[in-house]
């Protein structure tokens, strides 16, 4: 198997929806096929690269633009870019899609908010409820349901593992092809 074109795959969903977990599982699938890939995890990239630690609306737009710039640089290499971040508005996602054109796929990790709140591995929802943080998607910031995702993964309902569904999508779109 080989990659036929540059592609970035953007995972979106609530905090604790399973974006990073699925991104890692998908990367392992690509590794098995010897297809080079890299993950941009929202939390890690913010800590490593961005000065801006704020999560207000203006900062989130600035963050989306920064991810876009990084994506354009990384896409010059022939690899799969996997981006795990919530980009919670359709405006943010449309901006990225418009700029990356046919090098963009959107995967919506559709996990109910109540499930995300129960998982809460980073204690974000708990901190929000106690008034310790604000600007939380699923708290005081609304997550806008994507209107044009390439794939919707319902973590509680799907029988096929998400990473297999994504791989199937890439094969169907001939982004990954047999090397015969």
Predicted regions and their residues:
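Small-molecule kinase domains that catalyze NTP-dependent phosphoryl transfer to phosphate-bearing small molecules
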Residues: 110-113, 118-165, 172-180
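Hydrophobic anchor at the beta1->P-loop junction of P-loop NTPases
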Residues: 11
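Glycine-rich phosphate-binding loop used to anchor ATP phosphates in small-molecule kinases
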Residues: 48, 58-106, 125-128, 135-136
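Conserved lysine of the Walker
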Residues: 19
